[in-house]
Amino acid sequence: MKLLHLDSSALGANSISRELSAAVVEQQRRLHPEVDVSYRDLDRDPIPHLTAQTLAQTDPAEAAAAEAVMQQFLQADVIVIGAPMYNFAIPSTLKAWIDRIAVAGRTFQYTANGPEGLAGGKRVIIASARGGLYADPTNDFQEPYLRQVLGFLGVDDISFVRAEGVAYSPQHRADALASALAGLSEEEAAAGA
């Protein structure tokens, strides 16, 4: 089994989404000892945003880098994404990655019956950290967007591990992280049963 682990937080060691995504990967290692993990830090090693130049793919090095991102996605059975909520959505570094994998004819196609995803059969686990509480979905453009774009590509096995309200106070941050990690432990225990 191949697992692709992505982090997109700019907060480095202070990032809750990084801590959660690492915990998810460790859980997957315990459940599947044979797992082959690839890692990309989209903050430290960002993918260039789409421009007229990158779309034209006139630079062979740029084209090769884009193809490497695509192949890494296509070959993964499980994808773990550390995705903090920035301004109600996702970091632009994560959006740049999505722009490189959402390619007509590769991961989706248009048919007479409408769009069809070509990248099914994958499991995506999103480790989400949010400064506020988003029980009211009108302010949440992160989770619906990720579900929509991944679903458009054919991915229908999508789950979220959330730590919310982490900016309220140090205690709330610790409690939110502990709750998210406890949920992972419960899931692992159920999978092992």
Curated annotation (Swiss-Prot):
* UniProt similarity note: Belongs to the azoreductase type 1 family.
Q: What is this protein called?
A: FMN-dependent NADH:quinone oxidoreductase 1
Task: Name its species.
Answer: Xanthomonas axonopodis pv. citri (strain 306)
Q: How is the cofactor bound here?
A: Binds 1 FMN per subunit.
InterPro entries attached here? Flavodoxin_fold, Flavoprotein-like_sf, FMN-dep_NADH:Q_OxRdtase_AzoR1, NADH:quinone_OxRdtase_FMN_depd
Cofactor entry: FMN
| Binding residues annotated for FMN, in chain numbering | S9, S15, I16, S17, M85, Y86, N87, F88
What EC numbers are recorded for this enzyme? 1.6.5.-, 1.7.1.17
Top enzyme category:
oxidoreductase
Question: What cystine pairs are annotated?
Answer: none
Keywords, sorted A to Z: Flavoprotein, FMN, NAD, Oxidoreductase
Function noted in UniProt: Quinone reductase that provides resistance to thiol-specific stress caused by electrophilic quinones.
Q: Does the keyword Transmembrane helix apply?
A: no
